[in-house]
Swiss-Prot record:
GO cellular component, one term: cytoplasm
Similarity comment: Belongs to the thioester dehydratase family. FabA subfamily.
Name the record gives this protein: 3-hydroxydecanoyl-[acyl-carrier-protein] dehydratase
Annotated compartments: Cytoplasm
Species of origin: Shewanella sp. (strain W3-18-1)
Length: 171
């Protein structure tokens, strides 16, 4: 198992193709839905709860696909994409820990938006604090997270939940 503590864009894309942690590990989305350019740090003993943390980044430029359609003459990154990135990172964490199966977002306790990501921004930073992981018949990760744009916190989410399933046909 790869226990590196940082990952570049090529490695994240490899995760989306099942080539980073193995063909049965949870996968990240690829292409436009991959909302992460790099994982700066990942560990299993840091963070607010001492159970792990992830810091990841997305470079922002005015040419990103969502600025052309959300909204015409009022471009802003959809808040749901930042939230999805947080779920992506919880699923990645479970794969990094060795979980096998297909990752699925299961919910979130509370989400707050107090700002926006505009085309003139330079960088989005995601900071996740792992609260709990379960590795039994049920594999699940729970985390709290914030999103910063150019160093200013604009989103927060509590109790982000991602499960990993061997069979999603009846989910």
């Amino acid at each position: 198992m790869n226990k590196a503590n940082s990952f570049n864009k090529e490695e994240l894309i490899a995760c989306g193709h099942g080539k980073l942690f193995g063909p049965n590990s949870p996968r990240l989305p690829v292409d436009n839905m991959l909302m992460i350019d790099r994982i700066v740090t990942i560990n299993d003993n840091g963070g607010e709860f001492g159970k792990g943390e992830i810091v990841a980044e997305l470079d922002i430029n005015p040419e990103l696909w969502f600025f052309d359609c959300h909204f015409i003459s009022d471009p802003v990154m959809p808040g749901c994409l930042g939230l999805d990135a947080m779920w992506q990172l919880v699923g990645f964490y479970l794969g990094w820990e060795g979980a096998e199966g297909k990752g699925r977002a299961l919910g979130v306790g509370e989400v707050k938006f107090t700002g926006q990501v505009l085309p003139g921004a330079k960088k989005v930073t995601y900071k996740l604090n792992i609260k709990r992981t379960i590795h039994r018949k049920l594999v699940m990760g729970i985390a709290d997270a914030i999103l910063e744009v150019d160093g200013r916190q604009i989103y927060s989410a509590t109790d982000l939940k991602v499960g990993v399933f061997s069979d999603t046909s009846t989910f």
